[in-house]
């Protein structure tokens, strides 16, 4: 396994910040599975977010910089950070979370699975999809992608909903929800029908009142 001493941590970000004249305030070790890997905070956090977003989206740094539309960021500073970050990790033999995914894909080996279930698959970014499709699926006898495109909220993080909707030719759409009361469902449909890219669903919902469901 990976030695924890090799993981890029807070002390490393502090030292990197001193080298490039930037401040990192957010928790930089948050993983993709925990939500936002890309923190919005001090200047250093925003620059680091651009670096990591480019890698997870698998686009060039310049494209990510242009797509970010943050006029408080400067291209030259981003390039300086990118080089310093890469050089620091190489000199100190450190890995960040994205490095771990890239290394896993490059090595191309995983345990053998009889059944692989990819939960919350609507939230996978392009790099994660490569990990799933190129490494995990070939080592699995059967694969299920579980998710709900109506709950896809991480497009800002590079997630492409098309990747989830096209993940499998065979789809099973559940026809009953015990989570959402009918009153909430009725209201939500007026909003979600404005979304053009989505899986159509014919779902029946519980007739419990909203406050009864929330109390359970």
List where the protein language model places each region:
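Residues that form generic nucleotide/phosphate-binding pockets
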Residues: 16-23, 27, 31, 50-54, ...
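Accessory N-terminal region flanking or inserted into the helicase ATPase core
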Residues: 31-117, 126-131, 155
């Amino acid at each position: 396994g990976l030695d924890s001493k090799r993981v890029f941590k807070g002390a490393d970000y502090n030292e990197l910040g001193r080298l490039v004249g930037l401040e990192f305030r957010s928790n930089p070790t948050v993983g993709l599975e925990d939500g936002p890997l890309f923190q919005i905070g001090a200047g250093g956090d925003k620059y680091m977010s651009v670096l990591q977003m480019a890698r997870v989206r698998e686009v060039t740094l310049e494209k990510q910089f242009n797509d970010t539309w943050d006029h408080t960021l400067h291209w030259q500073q981003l390039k300086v950070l990118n080089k310093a970050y890469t050089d620091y990790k190489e000199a100190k033999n450190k890995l960040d979370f994205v490095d771990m995914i890239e290394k896993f894909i490059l090595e191309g080996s995983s345990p053998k699975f009889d059944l692989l279930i990819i939960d919350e698959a609507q939230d996978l970014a392009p790099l994660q999809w490569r990990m799933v499709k190129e490494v995990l699926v070939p080592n699995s006898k059967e694969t299920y992608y579980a998710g709900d495109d109506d709950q896809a909220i991480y497009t800002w993080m590079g997630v492409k909903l098309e990747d989830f909707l096209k993940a499998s030719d065979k789809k099973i759409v559940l026809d009953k929800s015990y989570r959402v009361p009918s009153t909430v469902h009725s209201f939500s449909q007026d909003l979600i029908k404005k979304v053009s890219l989505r899986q159509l669903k014919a779902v029946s919902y519980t007739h419990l009142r909203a406050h009864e469901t929330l109390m359970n």
